[in-house]
A protein has these predicted regions:
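Charged docking surfaces used in two-component/phosphorelay signaling
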Residues: 17-25
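C-terminal output helix
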Residues: 105-119
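Acidic catalytic/metal-coordinating carboxylates
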Residues: 35-38, 62-65, 89
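Short amphipathic alpha-helix used as the core "switch/output" element in two-component signaling
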Residues: 41, 64-75
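Receiver (REC) domain active-site loop signature in two-component systems and cognate sites
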Residues: 58
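Active-site residues of response regulator receiver
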Residues: 10, 55, 82
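Acidic, metal-coordinating helix/loop segments flanking the phosphotransfer/catalytic sites
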Residues: 7, 32-51
């Protein structure tokens, strides 16, 4: 069985690497995007992405817009992983269709556990 593909979208390369390292330890296949436009390109090119981990504040296209676009024609699970921990932001995320909302700073082990739970 092929490892599930997870697209990690964050404009900070250190954050992408941290998340990628923890996910790869659990045998997930991780793709990375540094902004929303790149994320959309990868999402439409790779037809079998199992889950997205998405930052909100990014250049070119923010996480809210990526979520709106993806939800137009996909129910792929989305985890928002963002420094925007305000209640309004979290509620907006759920309104737009995210499956989980995690505020930074976060526990990488808890993030991986949530990914595994969503994909179970």
């Amino acid at each position: 069985m092929e490892a599930p593909k997870i697209l990690v979208v964050d404009d900070e390369s250190r954050m992408r690497k941290l998340v990628k390292d923890f996910l790869e330890k659990k045998n997930f296949h991780v793709l990375e995007a540094g902004d929303g436009e790149e994320a959309m390109d990868i999402f439409y090119k790779e037809k079998d992405i199992a889950l997205l981990i998405l930052d909100v504040m990014m250049p070119k296209m923010d996480g809210w817009e990526v979520c709106r676009e993806i939800r137009k024609n996909s129910k792929v699970p989305i985890i928002m992983l963002t420094a925007r921990g305000d209640e309004r932001d979290e509620l907006l995320g759920f309104e737009l269709g995210v499956d989980e909302y995690i505020s930074k700073p976060f526990s990488p082990k808890i993030l991986v556990a949530r990914v595994e739970a969503i994909l179970r």
